Amino acid sequence: MVKIAVLKEAASGENRVAATPETVKKFIALGASVAVENGASAGASIPDADYEAAGATLGTQTATAWDADIVLGVQGPDPKSLKGVKDGAWIVAGLDPFGQRARIDAYAKAGVEALAMEFMPRITRAQSMDILSSQSNLSGYKAVIDAAGAYGRAFPMMMTAAGTV
């Protein structure tokens, strides 16, 4: 059985999590076991209990990574956090391999493979895994919401999911 680990993001201000409880259910339905680090989704306001209800096991960073075949991340985890992963395990995250070369080299030295999700082809078949489009879309949406709040007046003819203002 493949073990998938979801670690808490270490970067300051990073509130996203690499897998939601819905995603965990899908992985388990495919025959994988999923371990989630305690508090991994606190910044995203998803309680640990939701992961347990989805079938994941919760634990410390070390217990979560121990014997993992795949480690999911929003950003690449610190190589020191990968103690105990299987030799040849996969790190699947946004890795910034050109800007974080030392981290990529540390993954190789630790015997793990790295899949930089930002290099996923931007084609229809891979659209559900395209992190650049989805995250850019969310960033743009949030920027408009923030701008509207700072503007102080209503935006005329603004079209939203709730209707047109």
Regions found by a protein language model. Name each.
Residues V2-A106, A110:
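An N-terminal-biased, well-structured beta-alpha scaffold segment characteristic
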Residues V2-K3, E9, P79-V165:
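Glycine/serine-rich phosphate-binding loop and adjoining beta1-alpha1 elements at the start
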